[in-house]
Amino acid sequence: MLTDPRLRSVFRRMVSRADIGHRYSFLNPNKGSGQFSSHDANEFYQLGNFPNTARRMELFEQSAPMLMRKAVDRLALNATERSGITHVLVTCCTGLYAPGLDFEIVDHLGLSAGVERTMIGFMGCYAAINALKLARHIVRSEPGAGVLMVNLELCTLHFQETQDLEQVLSFLVFADGAAASLITAREQGFALDSFKAVTTPETRGLITWKIRGLGFDMLLSGQVPAELGRALHETELMAERDDIDLWAVHPGGRSVLDAVQKGLDLPADALAASREVLSRFGNMSSATVMFVLERMMQQARPGQRGCAMSFGPGLTAETMRFHAV
């Protein structure tokens, strides 16, 4: 995509430093050597003729439900758990249609037509934390509630033909993925204790996500890690960090994790789970922090206290305090 040799050199250098070993896409990549007329085996991204937004949304509507079903099925909900679902929450910033994924979930699980549905859209990578906050409010106000949350993103649906280095570098980290979770009042897994948002309005232009004629247009400034580290250093987390055993930090990129670790003066292994998810899956926007929490849940000891953290446009950091039951 980049034609300037200097920019290509910078891109190759950044690839070598990304600490991403694998990413997934719902599109099949071209493999092997030689000249191609398309960036993918599906010939969706044909050279010089990238699809418009309408075509991308058509493909989202065709493809997203399958990924949603796989994520929900991994929960292996029994009949009692299914019948106890009263609310469905969906986060997604990479595609939209109506009736949407919330309806698809109800149909797939055969849920009651009276299930309450909420879509949290276009908030970016921190949307899962916001959805967990909403789920906690629901369960606290309705103790018998069961909230099924799905976080689904097809980031590779918005690949762009561009010579803008910052935009091309953003493609380097993003990938596709989905996560599903069940939030109830039962004492198991992680208990959600409290939430807080940290915003730095003077940096609102450093991450943007806008709908254009040829897909959704991402800007991820190289200034984000430094500004994020500075903002976190000035929060109460600095004083509380010794009380936190588990750090579930959204792996927005290696430089983001490095900035968080430095800004909060965390031990070298504090972000091991986040770095593993980044290496194995890349940045899947809102779904990513749920992958980190899943890994922590498998190893956490009862009573351990944690802090989950995701970042996005604003510049915003959404945080969640939790403990293992």
Task: Provide a role label for each language-model segment.
Residues 71-85, 232-246, 264, 296-300:
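Phosphate/pyrophosphate-binding loops at sites that engage ATP/ADP/AMP, CoA/4′-phosphopantetheine
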Residues 1-59, 146, 155, 159-230, ...:
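Condensing-enzyme catalytic core mediating Claisen C-C bond formation in acyl metabolism
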Residues 93-94, 112-114, 119-140, 229, ...:
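Claisen-condensing/thiolase-fold acyl-transfer catalytic domains that form or cleave C-C bonds
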Residues 51, 83-87, 107-121, 162-166, ...:
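Glycine/charged-rich beta-loop-alpha catalytic/anionic-binding loops adjacent to active sites
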Residues 96-111, 149-160, 204-207, 257-271:
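Acidic-glycine-rich active-site phosphate/pyrophosphate-binding loop
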Residues 83-86, 113-116, 141-147, 168-169, ...:
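Short coil/turn connectors at secondary-structure junctions
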Residues 48-83, 87-89, 93-96:
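Hydrophobic alpha-helical hairpins/lids featuring a short glycine-rich hinge
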